[in-house]
Amino acid sequence: MTYVDGFVAAVPTANREKYRIHAEKAAVVFKEHGALKLVECWGDDVPDGELTSFPMAVQCKPGETVVFSWILWPSRQARDEGMKKVMADPRSKPDVNPMPFDGKRLIYGGFEMIVDA
């Protein structure tokens, strides 16, 4: 069963190109270790909420943009094995491919796909 890792982050708007380059480099590593696809989306219409919202969830500050991303894997097992390899891959190290955003406010989780229409 297809498995999805989902991510939401706040990225300094001025770092859009740095983020795109970071994500492209990361995508190569993830795909080499079993990911089927990696998608990165730059916030365009992401409203503030009163109780909950993407900006609130990642404590988005002025001058930051919400990014929504996901990685598709063939299965949970493939994801677990692949993620271990990604984390051990030297190309994933912060000194090689630094994150151009505050990783402490990154939200992520793994999800079983139940509808793919």
At which residue positions do the language-model features occur?
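Short amphipathic alpha-helices in soluble, non-transmembrane regions
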Residues: 20-26, 82-90
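Long, hydrophobic N-terminal alpha-helical segment
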Residues: 1-21, 25
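Glycine-rich beta-strand-turn "strand-cap" elements at beta-sheet edges
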Residues: 31, 37-62, 88-117
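Short, well-ordered beta-strand segments in beta-rich or mixed alpha/beta enzyme
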Residues: 4-11, 49-86
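N-terminal pre-domain and mature-chain start segments
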Residues: 25, 29-33
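Conserved long hydrophobic alpha-helices within structured protein cores
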Residues: 33-42, 73-75, 81-82
